[in-house]
Amino acid sequence: MKIGIVCYPTYGGSGVVATELGIALAEAGNEVHFISYDQPFRLDLFSEKIYYHEVAVADYPLFEFTPYELNLTSKLVDVVLHEKLNILHVHYAIPHASAAVNAKHILATHGINIPIITTLHGTDITLLGKDKSFKPVIEYAINMSDIVTDNDKVKPKKTHTVERV
């Protein structure tokens, strides 16, 4: 299976969990493609089953803030199309799950239905979920994911609200 994993490349828990999961999946014979703005710090690329795709984050004079989520969405579309990925596993509701959902809609115009697994790591709900400006995006990203996991528990596909997750 060809699996895309989207995570933060930093020392935090979500990046560690995503990287270790990807390494284990590669050791089990899967082809794993990490997609992030930097190589995850625990990722060893000396495996013929592990690939890294960097999300280019360019500064544009028009934007006060770099639109990382849009760059990530475009990169996800590109990697799924060119690497023929079977599934996307994203860690964190925003910007990763929301970018994956947008990519899924774009890929549908190419006749591709890519399943999305979203793993929540707590702070994306407890911290970001408290900010009402993020709530509709978080709920949408979670609800549009095919599978939602949280601390190694799989949640059935149903409508989630930030308060219930």
Model-derived segments and their meaning:
Residues L62-I87, A97-S98, N102, K132-P136, ...:
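An amphipathic, basic-hydrophobic alpha-helix
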Residues P40, P95-H96, V154-P156:
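Alpha-helix capping/helix-boundary segments
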Residues C7-Y11, I23-Y68:
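N-terminal strand-loop element at the rim of the active site
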Residues G13-A24, S133:
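Conserved alpha-helical elements of sugar-nucleotide-dependent glycosyltransferases
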Residues M1-G4:
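Extreme N-terminal starter segment of soluble prokaryotic enzymes
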Residues P156-V165:
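Helix-loop-beta element that forms the nucleotide-linked donor phosphate-binding surface
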Residues L107-I117, T123-M144, T149:
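Nucleotide-sugar donor phosphate/pyrophosphate-binding loop at the beta->alpha transition
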